């Protein structure tokens, strides 16, 4: 220390001047101030914090703050002499901040190099708000524009290049808007340059290129973010890129002048025309244009290569390291979470949704086909040289971001316990750079299911569901696709799939068992082709005549069986006898036949109904459904199966629909039952009883099998694993066949095509689902899993909700996406999201912590979905918009129908009791045009409308006439139509149908009602094939099937009138429907008038048949005709004929203009129909008449059930088979109606039926379906009539008393036809002939039934006069004014009792009613067959086995018919023996009677009388307008009717349950169905 001091002293010993000392001190101080970095950084930040905390309230404070900000950004600043202007400058630009004397901001101007200062609004706003941080960011952005090494000249060139790029991009954005007039959302998702925000101040130009559905919702408020041209779009919304220019090590030729020539695009996409790059307009710069991401995004190796190929500039160097792409996606998603900290996820993530807990394992290392795992990297910016590259780059980035969004939807910070009860496990694994799979356990079976999502581009996601061949269907591919595109969320989609599967499971728990049983039975009992039972078919059988041209099968075993007398078949040797049992079982027969048809349909899915695809495809679908079924199909003529299956296209379409549809087809089997009754021996009856019981136990499974088959058909388009979704969804929407015989097969085939159609059209799916939902109104429909579609749609109303569950899609009722979605299915499909009982949770799907409940419901979401879809934001959105609400979704107003029209329908359904028809018509906004209505409604609205409206309407209709109102009108109409309406149908078809109607004045009235049922079917006019296949029912069946339908002038009218729905209107079908409509319409026309809408027929205006007829006529003529027919039928037939009247004749005829003819001819019968009208009314107008409804379904419910599924297949409805009646399912109109016309009718009927709960709707629909699907078989009576006229079909006039041979031929032809015409006859003849209700129940059944009928008719003259006129079948009873609701059933009995009775013979109905008296048995059966009997297996069962029939709601629909004492009684007897559901025996009873000996008939009659008395009392209580006699059976019928309406399941449940419960509505039905299960 001392030495140091010495040195200092020696060094400074000399005295320095003071100035030098001061200078030295200053130097030291300056150095210290200039060293404020590193160690002083903390002090600097503290000073800045203090400065920010100071309030800027004076001029000096403001200038100090501005100088500080400039200094922080490396810029210089100075003040003007007066101190009110502050300049922040740099070499390339400067800012001018103008202040007043108090320090308040006046303006901020920015001046770039050599440019005049320009005011910047954003900077002004920020400084006025004292937002100095954002102001500082702007300064940084300005500095970065010129952040290039080099002199000012180079910087100027770079700025010019950036400026030219911005001008070009701005012009491109303007051109796109000019060419497309796109909305903000469309610009973002599809715009060539996205949504462009120009550069402002220091914020560079940004392009918004993608927003997910969740981006459109405000997390805090839950409200959707509005994107409109008038409002600024937040820069932070969605995914954005910034357009910049940055220095690079390489030289690039960049344009320094705009390259776009002119101001108009060269195409309709806004593509501009660029000038070529030249030295004059570009320069070489050490810089490049960049699209910069705010945060690096994960991009897979494949997309990086695509981008590099597009730009020609490498994005990454060769040494770059790639990581598992899914790992990068999870990191990216977790980084967006506001919650800090890392998540130890181990690639396992949990999602908590309403009612479900999911665990997702993201398999990041899953090998791709090339053996490598999916690799990717984080991309921060993309270089490019030309503005024309921007659209391509954005398209690729959108695609990648869409994939990332889906994968990222599984990534949540939610934590759940591993042992959480009910935790669902899912594995997400990549299959390619844009395709991945989600594997999970099958909801029903213990097997693995896989959903493959292929993100084709940012707006299209293709989904396929892969399952085992034996696995139950879950939902359609289209449904999944719509859900995904709606929400872009895997958890939401998985929940929707799960809920849909649960609905289906509830509806078809025993499908597998049924399939196995059927298979075993077939293997053991299948006789050789030459065996008498199998091959004995008269060459002239109607079946063979009806054989679809495209069908590779000749009128083989099944047709021969139809042709054979019952005794002959019974007498068949061992195997033949066993096989007889099988074939006699409506369910089994329909199932088997449906399988056949299904295959055929599959093959020709895209072809119109007339062109039935070769049966070759049938085996595939059968195989998918069940090997046994496939084999059986090979032996059986495709025609019969087509008819059976064609009757329930919707069912096929929906995953649940396929099995059920086939079961529903077995409705014809029921008629068979009736045949046995005519000439059957006790031994045979017993066998049939046993067999039915077996079938019933296996019903659900067999339905599943059917589902598989249906799926198989769909599978044609889906992977070999048989993706259930597409298979299920498509088939139902197939065209209805215009040619009767072709139609039968075609219907089935059409369904398959439907599937194809459904995939693109969620609306169709939803419609199908809606129809199915309405078809499966009651728990009793468990058996009729033909209502599989219903399952898809959450059973009945719920099916809709399931398809497009509100929970699934919050957009518009959430359910709307069927779906599609529909189902809608989108339809499973997004349908009954409103309050569908099957809905797992409220309409708001995202109630859970992880999902925004409003996400999917918001309009913007809709827009998003639409925009998200390549089609445009409207595509997806519109579909869901069509599902504007759960209600609309339920209505099936998804995409096919205009939202307004759909709403109108829905509103109408809600609004008017009697306006059922008008509702449908109104809903379709084409009330006057049956075809239009059918097409519109059936395709989109009718099914869903039927379901939804059915719900609403049930309430309204309940008020009106419970049984007669609404769907019952359609359904009942259909059923009675089967019996009496067959005649009417014929008559409708041709003027001579009037003669038929006249033949049986009292019964005729019922018949007319039945005819109206066909009319309803006619409603399906748009799908005349349905009519021929099912709707053509009595009159049309035989005729329409062949030349008759085509020859009959009314058919051409029908075709014209029903251009859309009618497909080729299936001249036979069309005319049949219309004929039927005409005949019934004559009488039912009045009732139509009374109804003046669906309601009209449904209105309990038994007494005012004339008024009903007139109103019905009006409706029919106005295009509400379909409904009108239903309505007229309901009113006219009140009890017995009500169904047939309103259903077939009135509406269709009216629609076709045949109404006047029919009206006139039926005019005298209007009054008798008046009673039946009530029956019809129940199904049409009143939920109350639900039983009636069911009844019609009962008679035709089995058909109806199967048909209901068909409604699920509105297009198939076109195919018209009983299923075609699908429309009828909903409205009781016709199969055709189901898709379009039927949809309209069904819609209306359904609407009315819906009040009956899904059950009632189903019943009505079903009956209607059956009726429409088998115009001739709209009811047994209808069959008789139809057989007379339809069977003969060719003869425009339906002679009331054709020769027995002619009648038999007609019946056979109708049955054998299995085609549009044949199907109807079959439906009518078999279903109708047997019970009218059974015939109504299922097209296929009807086909079989027809065969049986011919046999029965051969057995007795009843068949002759009644059989031909519907006498052999319940329809005949229906025809008899006496038999009311039980017409179909009663008719069958009556026919038996009075084979030669002709139409009047139907009065034997009392006896039939007695059989219906076996209602106790029916109830018990109903309980057994809850949901499925009618709609699916149950219905076929019922048709095939009296017991099943009686059990099933399908039988109950018969009960509706049988509610008219005679029909019900007859069938009740039969079905009573066969099953506990004997109460419903009206329809099944008739067949049972056929099967049973006279002794048993007597006993059953007595029992049924008792039951009838009770039932009548019950019905009276239920406010059924039908006569007490018919209602005496009707109670069971009523309940069964409900069941029928709701489906066979419903029938059982509903049978025991009062009509009111059935009338409760779709919701009720849905509830019932699960209960049944």
Swiss-Prot record:
Pfam families, per database record: Med1
Gly residues composition-biased segments: 963-973
Compositional bias segments (type: Basic and acidic residues): 678-691, 949-961, 1350-1362, 1506-1518
InterPro entries given in the database record: Mediator_complex_subunit_1 (IPR051999), Mediator_Med1 (IPR019680)
Bias kind Basic residues: ranges: 1496-1505
Superkingdom in the source lineage: Eukaryota
Residue ranges of the motif LXXLL motif 1: 588-592
Recorded GO MF terms: transcription coregulator activity
Gene for this chain: med1
Protein name from the UniProt record: Mediator of RNA polymerase II transcription subunit 1
Assembly with partners or alone: Component of the Mediator complex.
Positions with biased composition (Low complexity): 1025-1038, 1053-1085, 1092-1116, 1124-1143, 1155-1164, 1226-1277, 1461-1471
Biased composition regions of type Pro residues, renumbered to the chain: 606-617
GO cellular component labels: mediator complex
Compositional bias annotation for Polar residues: 651-668, 791-804, 835-864, 934-944, 1176-1193, 1278-1290, 1420-1435, 1443-1457
Keywords on record: Activator, Nucleus, Transcription, Transcription regulation
Annotated family: Belongs to the Mediator complex subunit 1 family.
